[in-house]
Amino acid sequence: MIIEELHIVNFKSIAAADCRFSPKVNCLVGNNGMGKTNLLDALHFLSFCRSHLSVPDNMVVRHGEEMALLQGLYRDESGDGIELLLSIRPGKHKVLRRNKKEYERLSDHIGHFPLVIVSPQDYQLILGGSDERRRFMDQQLCQQDPRYLSALIQYNRHLQQRNTMLKQDRHDDALMDVLELQMGSYAAEIYNKRSRFIEDFLPVFNDLYSDISGSAEKVSLSYRSHLADGIPLEELLRRSRPKDYLLGFSSCGVHKDELEMLLGGVLIRKIGSEGQNKTFLISMKLAQFRHQQLHGDETPILLLDDIFDKLDATRVERIIRLVGGNGFGQIFITDTNRKNLDEIIASWSEDYRLFEIENGQIFQ
């Protein structure tokens, strides 16, 4: 999958832009705060119908304007052209059209335009709470498996309903039994698919970390869940119900799962240096790309947002060699340093385009 053209109106700091991209390498240069990340976020929005930066929709419409528009012209691996048109109005539902036909549900769009982004905000994957790491697993699986996405949506709806019931003075245990049985069914599917995903993902991640770091450091991932002992969630919920009534929320379930990230058998967030953390993160995201490529129908678009800062020259060279190989498709790279991008371009013989971005304006 590649994007050939992107047209932007009133998205964040970008008042208007018309971009035509290389099918291989696209370099975006500009100082911080000029709009490089906003352009990448527009691409992310077209794939996932939300910002990578987890900001609400009303914050992506340019200040003082009523609506933002994003239009992307794509070409899939069979050679077919596809137009996406997304309109965003604060306080209203987003409207997404594919080849002029509106989606009834935005969730039906997820996974058809695969994209992987590596950015400074992704440090929360290592340093943040467990919800960040669950989101990582969920995003990958939702792109590949509509049934997983459906199970996750239904589980979260039932979880919200159970939490509401836990706060009520009157306890309806019969209704709670039914609700917990349904949650157990969805949770089993989520747990099983997360477990298989990590089993498939781990060797890919290990190989990439070794390639980038050039060291024998042992890294690993460990998936922890209340369901790991084989007890159905409905039974766990029934046992925890008295405690949960006191707490006012559900204290067990797949919404509490954890993905531990380990360096030498210890949580990397406790011992990792800045360089080790960054290498771990980039390896995770490139492994996400590889996994999506292996298990999806289309090669994802890869966005690398200011990832070379604080990495030594050797690791930068290894990353460039990896993503410059034939296994990667269309790539977008941002940097504040024009010299860095010139060196990257010089190492590639691929078709490339360079864009300079200043105060929300994009120059090619």
UniProtKB/Swiss-Prot annotation:
SUPFAM superfamilies: P-loop containing nucleoside triphosphate hydrolases (SSF52540). Gene3D superfamilies: P-loop containing nucleotide triphosphate hydrolases, RecF/RecN/SMC, N-terminal domain. ATP binds at residues 30-37. It comes from the Bacteria. GO terms for cellular component: cytoplasm. Pfam families: SMC_N. GO terms for molecular function: ATP binding; single-stranded DNA binding. Keywords: ATP-binding, Cytoplasm, DNA damage, DNA repair, DNA replication, DNA-binding, Nucleotide-binding, SOS response. GO terms for biological process: DNA replication; DNA synthesis involved in DNA repair; double-strand break repair; SOS response. It is found in: Cytoplasm. Signal peptide: none annotated. InterPro entries: DNA-binding_RecF, DNA-binding_RecF_CS, P-loop_NTPase, RecF/RecN/SMC_N, RecF_2. HAMAP family: RecF. The RecF protein is involved in DNA metabolism; it is required for DNA replication and normal SOS inducibility. RecF binds preferentially to single-stranded, linear DNA. It also seems to bind ATP. Belongs to the RecF family. This is DNA replication and repair protein RecF.
